[in-house]
Curated annotation (Swiss-Prot):
ATP binds at residues 10, 58, 86, 92, 103, 113. It comes from Nitratidesulfovibrio vulgaris (strain DSM 19637 / Miyazaki F) (Desulfovibrio vulgaris). This is Nucleoside diphosphate kinase. The keyword Metal-binding applies. Its cofactor is Mg(2+). It is found in: Cytoplasm.
Length: 139
């Protein structure tokens, strides 16, 4: 059954002109891009998006990093899209990521790990709605 998930290509990857290469990996995996936009998050937008981490010690540095440059947000669709994209991203810490994953290939650190992806259907729905309305999605 087709499912949707949310993806962010983070500032470190956008700055290094890796958006196209990462999108190619996503599409080559069989996932379909049904919505996409490039934005520069404000501090308020980043704080809202990562509100679930507000009490974590890394919250401030995460928000600062996510506001440091443009990001590419997209909605991906396909069978079992959430798990498939998480597998393609690789472990949060690129040192632990499997060969051939986005993070093993492109990430520079645990924070500047190039991509974000939803971890469950509930978070995918929240994250998609945070950045996109229904009119911005195709397919």
């Amino acid at each position: 059954m087709a499912e949707r998930t949310f993806s962010i290509i983070k500032p470190d990857a956008v700055e290094r002109n890796l958006s196209g290469a990462i999108l190619k990996m996503i599409q080559d995996s069989g996932l379909k891009v049904v919505a996409m936009k490039m934005i520069h998050l404000t501090r308020s937008q980043a704080e809202g998006f990562y509100a679930v981490h507000r009490e974590r010690p890394f919250f401030d540095s995460l928000v600062t990093y996510m506001c440091s440059g443009p990001v590419v947000c997209s909605v991906l669709e396909g069978d079992n899209a959430i798990q498939r994209y998480r597998d393609l991203m690789g472990a949060t810490n690129p040192a632990n990521a499997a060969e051939g994953t986005i993070r093993k290939t492109y990430a520079v650190s645990i924070e500047a790990n190039s991509v974000h992806g939803s971890d469950a259907p509930e978070t995918a729905a929240y994250e998609i709605a945070y950045f996109f309305n229904a009119l911005e999605m195709v397919g």
